[in-house]
UniProtKB/Swiss-Prot annotation:
The record marks 46-47 as: Reactive bond. InterPro entries: Kazal_dom, Kazal_dom_sf, SPINK2. This is Serine protease inhibitor Kazal-type 2. Keywords: Cytoplasmic vesicle, Disulfide bond, Protease inhibitor, Pyrrolidone carboxylic acid, Secreted, Serine protease inhibitor, Signal. GO terms for cellular component: acrosomal vesicle; extracellular region. GO terms for biological process: acrosome assembly; spermatid development. The gene is SPINK2. It comes from Homo sapiens.
Amino acid sequence: MALSVLRLALLLLAVTFAASLIPQFGLFSKYRTPNCSQYRLPGCPRHFNPVCGSDMSTYANECTLCMKIREGGHNIKIIRNGPC
């Protein structure tokens, strides 16, 4: 009986640990693609609305992320709104 409880506790611990790794490493990612078509060149608005890119860089706003994508041909997604 005690062995069964110990196994169940270890299984629960392992599942909890694995679930904590999912957002950290982007498994089953819900990253979103920035809508770069809404931003005209040149320049971006100066409003501060930071986004965290999948390259783990914080961008001042979605437009500055789109500029980075355009200049380097990178495929950067938005992990979340706010700084990284």
